[in-house]
Amino acid sequence: MRAELVSIPTETIPLDGLYYEPEGRAAGAALLFHGNTMNFYVGALRFLPPMLVKLGLACLAFNRRGHDILSTRNSRVPEGGAFQLAREGIEDNRSAARWMAERGFPHPVIIGHSNGGMLAVRHVADHPETPALALLSAHGGGRNIVQRGAQSGLMAGDRVEELAARARDMVKAGLGRELILMPGWWYAISAESFLDRMTETPDTLELAPKVRCPTLYIRGDREPRASYPAEDFGARAGGTCTVEIVADCDHFYNGREVVIQEIVSSWLSRMLHLQIAKS
């Protein structure tokens, strides 16, 4: 396996990532989309590529502009998930897909975790030639995403209306990139990002009928079905959908990484007629 740090340009900041290649000719490719406040070197984007490469797939795990919570690079200008916008996340995934196409892989498998899974559904709906989609605890998205998360103590908690009103006032005053502290994960968000999340987040279930390729949807048994609607997506999907509920498993697959590897790799090997290379 070979791995190369890469940088994909956008109209603002570049997308950093790690590109993996199998030894010899690749049988196909996969794009991996991370979840909220995460990045390409943690979670599923860290532990899946080695197994995907054994299937003969070239893989790109990359940061969207909305990675981590807050970060800087070669300046003191902040960036990261606190500033993310849905339209930028959608375009970042398209930029990564174009980057893969330039390397000879115009139709990669799409794999997304959590928020990356929701964005993966939007991407595949827009790219019907996608051969397969793997959703790892993809959330439901939609216009009630902030309220739904607040019921679990995330983000604004019981202060949704208060913080939304504050965010609207800040945007009107030209302070859209100023940060608001929240009582729950992810703890800090810009005013414009907060409002964008409330109104512009794609709806996973509304988009499901447009997904016609084979889909794998994984959810841990410790995750609420209402937030990660695997069965409902499967009922609405435009193509076949395999639902896997993993026992003793949280949202980040802690301690269950090998199980997730096995489920994803065996499903892809069946769907794409691939064989796992022996060590």
Positions of predicted regions on the chain:
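The serine-hydrolase catalytic nucleophile loop
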Residues: 37-49, 228-229
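Alpha/beta-hydrolase active-site loop
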Residues: 80-102
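Short beta-strand/loop motif that positions the catalytic acidic residue
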Residues: 211, 217-219
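Conserved loop-alpha-helix segment in the C-terminal half of the alpha/beta-hydrolase fold
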Residues: 221-242
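Conserved alpha/beta-hydrolase
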Residues: 49-75
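N-terminal cap/lid segment of alpha/beta-hydrolase-fold proteins
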Residues: 1-24
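Catalytic histidine-centered segment of alpha/beta-hydrolase-like enzymes
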Residues: 249-261
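Active-site nucleophile loop of the alpha/beta-hydrolase fold
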Residues: 134-144
